[in-house]
Structures are given as structure tokens and as C-alpha cells.
Amino acid sequence: MANKPSVDDLKENLSEMQFYVTQKHGTEPPYTGRLLHNKRDGVYRCLVCDTPLFNSQSKYDSGCGWPSFYEPVNENSIRYLTDLSHGMERIEIRCGHCDAHLGHVFPDGPQPTGERYCVNSASLSFTDEKSGDQIKG
């Protein structure tokens, strides 16, 4: 995929958890993510390549323990793959630009889409709309 940093660069610039989640398709423990309770207005971006993924307006509290969104910024920002791991069938979501693992999407979200994009904080950064401050998950 385009613009993906080298493994050495990723290991140098990401925490162990961020590398595990984005590159090894891992999952951070529920209720531990830095961006789970973030309520500020802004944009959630791919931690690896800075591609905009979700607007804060689509974030909601699903009670699942990870940041949840009902729709991505646009149809090209997310890549969808069938995930048959752990004895179940799920839809994995990855960054549409650099292929970093983000989480999964489920058909149990609120309207208007009915979808729940369940995303690891460790795969995201957040840019505050007003201040421009950036928080890494």
C-alpha cells in the first residue's frame, strides 16, 4: 500500500501496543484506550499515515470498551476484509491508505447507518477542531 513507513520506522515511532494493533492485527484491552472517552470535536486519523478516518460527529458510546463510530469520513478511507480468526466471522477494518489494522465493523450500530465501527484507540490519533492539538491513541 502507498505511503507505508518501513517496519524499522514503525518500531521506532510507535509504542509496543500501537505496533501490535496496527501491524500485527492485535486488539488493545477494552476500556483502556486513550481516545475512548474523548468528547472533543475534531477528526480521528490513522496513527500510521495520518489519513482522516472518522469525524467526531459519528462517534458514540456503544458500551463495548473501544471507540465506536457509525460511519467513516468517506468510502475510500476504510478497507474491509473478512476475518475468520478466533472461530468467528467478522469484518476487519484497515486504513484504506496504508493498510494499518483498525478494528472491526458490526451491523449493530445506530442510525443512520446501522453500523458500529469498533476501533482500537492505539490505531488512531485525534486532531482537535478548535486548537489543532493532536492526541495519539
Curated annotation (Swiss-Prot):
Out of the domains of life, which is the source?
Answer: Bacteria
Which GO BP terms, alphabetically? protein repair; response to oxidative stress
Write the record's keywords in alphabetical order, separated by commas: Metal-binding, Oxidoreductase, Zinc
| Domain MsrB span(s) in chain numbering | 7-129
Its needed co-factors are: Zn(2+)
Give the EC number(s) under which this enzyme is classified.
1.8.4.12
- Listed GO molecular functions? peptide-methionine (R)-S-oxide reductase activity; zinc ion binding
Entry's transmembrane regions:
none
Give a yes or no for keyword Phosphoprotein in this entry.
no
Note on cofactor: Binds 1 zinc ion per subunit. The zinc ion is important for the structural integrity of the protein.
Question: Catalytic residues per the record?
Answer: C118 (nucleophile)
Which residues of the sequence carry a binding annotation for Zn(2+)?
C46, C49, C95, C98
Catalytic activity reads:
L-methionyl-[protein] + [thioredoxin]-disulfide + H2O = L-methionyl-(R)-S-oxide-[protein] + [thioredoxin]-dithiol
Task: Write one Pfam family the protein is assigned to.
Answer: SelR
GO CC annotation:
cytoplasm
Give the coiled coil ranges: none
Q: Does the keyword RNA-binding apply?
A: no
Q: Which family does it belong to?
A: Belongs to the MsrB Met sulfoxide reductase family.
> What is the protein name stated in its UniProt record?
Peptide methionine sulfoxide reductase MsrB
State the organism of origin: Escherichia fergusonii (strain ATCC 35469 / DSM 13698 / CCUG 18766 / IAM 14443 / JCM 21226 / LMG 7866 / NBRC 102419 / NCTC 12128 / CDC 0568-73)
- Annotated gene: msrB
